[in-house]
């Protein structure tokens, strides 16, 4: 029902005094608080139905009264603020890691080759993937898998590669973040996604883009051995990606709100736990008969160490970043289940992932 109360002038004075004191505690003035509209007197006139003169006088008198009353009496020790009390800053997390953000850089996703079928058809060990904030692996075609190394800032990208052509299952995960998608070539289905969703302005690496007179400095070649095929020898870096973005008129700054996953709050040092679930000490993922990925939990370092099956050596091998010489390790591993099959009518076995 309707709540009614009688407010006397004395009540108005005390109410005004409390309001003024509260505003003072929050660093606001009675006449300049935006959340009250224009001013405290006007707000009181509307809510308490007092005249401007009454409300102004009430505010002035009450402020004086509140000050004297506050000075005359102190809170009990149990009710006083902790000397270490501080206001929690606004939540501003890195969208990929959940850690405190240090800038407003655009997310960059780089396609990385992962073929390992023979001495000639071999992209391992890759470079730069250990520095990625997020490493996505998905089956593409012919049973092979490919990586998309995702970085929260172009400045975090070392030399990376071998780079390879784009696929729509990776693009679909990057598009909601207006990320720069960097690759060499793309499937016809990836091109269709780019055209339908008008994403060409954030896509670098369409067919015939790399190593052309128009864009000569967006990647480089490294001859890894006499046996490795030419298509597995292309690399790039932060400097080259910046050059390509500049050539294309793409800004590498972009403000973000929200995060890729629902992270624990970095401000409180909280930890997300899945109560009542078994501990995942090992994880095994089979993409195809020749492409399998496994993770083993290291309780000492509290991370998951990554290994992949090699169709070249016919055994599992540690996944190593060639730049560091160390096995890849992750704090979190997320396994996504989705229907995946070749696009209908496609003769190249390009895979459609139904997210």
Model-derived features with residue positions:
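Short, flexible coil/linker elements and helix-boundary hinge sites characteristic
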Residues: 27, 40-41, 45-52, 249, ...
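Post-signal peptide N-terminal segment of mature Sec-exported envelope proteins
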Residues: 37-77
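Polar/charged alpha-helical tracts
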Residues: 4, 11, 38-46, 53, ...
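Bacterial lipoprotein signal-peptidase II cleavage site
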Residues: 29-36
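N-terminal secretory signal peptides
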Residues: 1-11, 15-26
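A surface/extracellular/periplasmic glyco- and lipid-processing/surface-interacting theme
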Residues: 75-134, 141-355
């Amino acid at each position: 029902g309707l709540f009614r109360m009688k407010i006397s002038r004395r009540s108005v004075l005390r109410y005004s005094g409390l309001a003024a004191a509260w505003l003072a505690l929050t660093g606001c003035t009675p006449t300049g608080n935006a959340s009250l509209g224009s001013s405290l007197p006007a707000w009181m006139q509307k809510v308490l139905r007092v005249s401007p003169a009454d409300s102004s006088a009430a505010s002035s008198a009450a402020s004086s009264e509140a000050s004297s009353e506050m000075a005359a009496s102190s809170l009990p020790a149990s009710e006083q603020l902790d000397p270490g009390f501080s206001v929690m800053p606004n939540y501003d997390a890195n969208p990929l890691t959940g850690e405190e953000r240090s800038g407003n850089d655009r997310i960059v996703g780089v396609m990385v080759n992962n073929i390992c079928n023979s001495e000639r058809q071999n992209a391992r060990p890759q470079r730069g993937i250990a520095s990625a904030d997020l490493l996505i692996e998905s089956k593409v075609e012919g049973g092979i898998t490919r990586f998309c190394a995702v970085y929260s800032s172009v400045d975090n990208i070392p030399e990376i590669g071998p780079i390879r052509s784009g696929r729509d299952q990776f693009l679909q995960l990057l598009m909601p973040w207006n990320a720069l998608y960097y690759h060499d070539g793309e499937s016809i289905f990836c091109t269709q996604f780019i055209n339908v969703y008008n994403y060409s302005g954030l896509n670098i690496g369409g067919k015939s883009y790399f190593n052309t007179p128009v864009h000569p400095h967006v990647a480089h070649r490294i001859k890894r051995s006499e046996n490795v095929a030419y298509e597995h020898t292309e690399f790039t870096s932060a400097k080259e990606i910046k050059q390509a973005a500049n050539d294309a008129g793409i800004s590498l700054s972009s403000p973000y709100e929200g995060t890729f996953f629902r992270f624990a709050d970095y401000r409180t040092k909280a930890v997300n736990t899945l109560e009542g679930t078994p501990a995942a000490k090992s994880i095994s993922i089979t993409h195809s008969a020749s492409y399998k990925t496994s993770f083993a939990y290291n309780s000492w370092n509290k991370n998951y160490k990554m290994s992949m099956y090699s169709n070249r050596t016919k055994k599992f091998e540690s996944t190593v970043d060639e730049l560091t010489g160390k096995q890849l390790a992750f704090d979190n591993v997320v396994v996504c289940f989705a229907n995946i099959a070749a696009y209908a009518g496609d003769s190249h076995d390009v895979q459609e992932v139904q997210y």
